Amino acid sequence: MTVEVGADENPDFAHDETDGAGDESDDEDAQGRDPELDLAVQYGDEIGDAQRKSLPKRKVIAEWLEPAIFSDTQFTVRFVGADEGRALNHSYRHKDYATNVLTFAYGEEPDGVTVADLVLCCPVVEKEAREQGKTLVAHYAHLLVHGALHAQGYDHERGEEDAAEMEALEIDILAKLGFPNPYR
């Protein structure tokens, strides 16, 4: 789900654990270099120390996101509990339930950098993985790739053709990362 908001409208998502992670990738931008990923990872108040240890680490998140970015990006990935997930979904989408991933796309900076926050609701992600018979790691990877594509303008809710394009990209990126098709 993509939410278009102005950067000044959402101060709760300050980029606080930031350092670049522009490693090798198959995609190069117009200047002939790999897109750079500036990544911060945050945890909501409901995410305790024990749960943090079980979540994907920053390096792994960067490895999953890098093949899904097509230009320089500045992402904050925030892991939240059910209460924060529900509050955000209600505030920005007027839906009174927590959803698996929300993408807050702030658009492109003048220098062409795509800026977005990807918010993952841990209890929802865990429940879906169990119900769908997926590993938790594969489901987190899928939702991060999904959110990254939303941040760059892909939208499965615009119609069948757009949905098919986004789904095909997700399947291809996840296959390159060694994950199975998430839609089977």
Curated annotation (Swiss-Prot):
A GO BP entry: rRNA processing
Gene3D superfamilies xrefs: Metalloproteases ('zincins'), catalytic domain
EC number: 3.1.-.-
Domain of life: Bacteria
Name of the protein this chain belongs to: Endoribonuclease YbeY
Function description: Single strand-specific metallo-endoribonuclease involved in late-stage 70S ribosome quality control and in maturation of the 3' terminus of the 16S rRNA.
NCBIfam families the record matches: PRK13963.1, rRNA maturation RNase YbeY
A GO molecular-function descriptor: zinc ion binding
A GO cellular component annotation in the UniProt record: cytoplasm
Cellular localization per UniProt: Cytoplasm
The encoding gene: ybeY
Region (Disordered): 1-37
Keyword set, alphabetical order: Cytoplasm, Endonuclease, Hydrolase, Metal-binding, Nuclease, Ribosome biogenesis, rRNA processing, Zinc
InterPro entries documented for this protein: MetalPrtase_cat_dom_sf_prd (IPR023091), YbeY (IPR002036), YbeY_CS (IPR020549)
